[in-house]
């Protein structure tokens, strides 16, 4: 008898729901949401597209162009949320400040938010933004799972060494509440582990399939 993770089927059926410039425009605050965060060019959109087997999240050659909260429905009560990229976008400072205010408002107010997937480029982990997100997760008690993206850019050994180093730094600075893994969108590395995290947060049990 096979055991199938039901989150896989839901992710494959993911559809775009809406974009929100501010919290008031978000869907009703009920059900289950998992948010995807990351510094610009950390591979957030590519990871989302790989997890959903679709081109839902916009990828751009200009990092940081995700300016809105983008919601994707898995079913009637479960959603993935693509948060604005942080960093390199060539936009006026007031607009960046606008993004940050509404990002903070979203993270601080959504009762249905069950966890945050934080993307870090495995070659440049633990940026100031990453540490800020880790501080927020610790202070709020929000579960956080880190994808060390672009693992295909390093050798297997170098990737494992970076994973262990970042794990150690996080454990010392933020405790044991944060989980972490290697991930590569082009190589589809780490998909099963990421799906298990999503299933747990969205309260989907593994179900036997005949």
Swiss-Prot record:
User: Which residues hold Mg(2+)?
Assistant: 45, 66
List the signal peptide residues.
none
Q: Which GO terms describe its biological process?
A: division septum assembly
Name what cofactor the protein needs.
Mg(2+)
Question: What InterPro entries does UniProt report for this protein, alphabetically?
Answer: G_ENGB_dom, GTP-bd, GTP-bd_ribosome_bio_YsxC, P-loop_NTPase
Q: Which residues bind GTP?
A: 38-45, 64-68, 82-85, 149-152, 182-185
Q: Which residues form the EngB-type G domain?
A: 30-204
What GO molecular function annotations does the UniProt record carry, in alphabetical order? Answer: GTP binding; metal ion binding
- Report whether RNA-binding shows up as a keyword of the record: no
Q: Which gene encodes it?
A: engB
Q: What does this protein do?
A: Necessary for normal cell division and for the maintenance of normal septation.
Which UniProt keywords are given for this protein, alphabetically ordered?
A: Cell cycle, Cell division, GTP-binding, Magnesium, Metal-binding, Nucleotide-binding, Septation
Designated name of the protein? Probable GTP-binding protein EngB
Coiled coil ranges:
none
């Amino acid at each position: 008898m096979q055991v199938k993770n039901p989150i896989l089927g839901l992710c494959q059926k993911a559809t775009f729901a809406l974009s929100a410039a501010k919290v008031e425009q978000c869907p009703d605050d009920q059900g289950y949401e998992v948010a995807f965060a990351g510094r610009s060019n950390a591979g957030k959109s590519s990871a989302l597209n790989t997890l959903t087997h679709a081109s839902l999240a916009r990828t751009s050659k200009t990092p940081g162009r995700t300016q809105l909260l983008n919601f994707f429905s898995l079913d009637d009560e479960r959603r993935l949320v693509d948060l604005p990229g942080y960093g390199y976008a060539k936009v006026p400072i007031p607009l960046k400040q606008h993004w940050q205010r509404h990002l903070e408002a979203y993270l601080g107010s959504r009762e249905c938010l069950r966890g945050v997937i934080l993307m870090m480029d495995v070659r440049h982990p633990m940026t100031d933004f990453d540490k800020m997100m880790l501080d927020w997760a610790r202070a709020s008690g929000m579960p956080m799972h880190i994808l060390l993206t672009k693992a295909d850019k390093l050798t297997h050994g170098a990737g494992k060494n970076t994973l262990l180093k970042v794990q150690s730094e996080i454990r010392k600075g933020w405790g044991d509440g944060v989980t972490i893994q290697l991930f590569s969108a082009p190589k589809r590395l780490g998909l099963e582990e990421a799906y298990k995290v999503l299933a747990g947060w969205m309260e989907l049990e593994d179900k036997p399939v005949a």
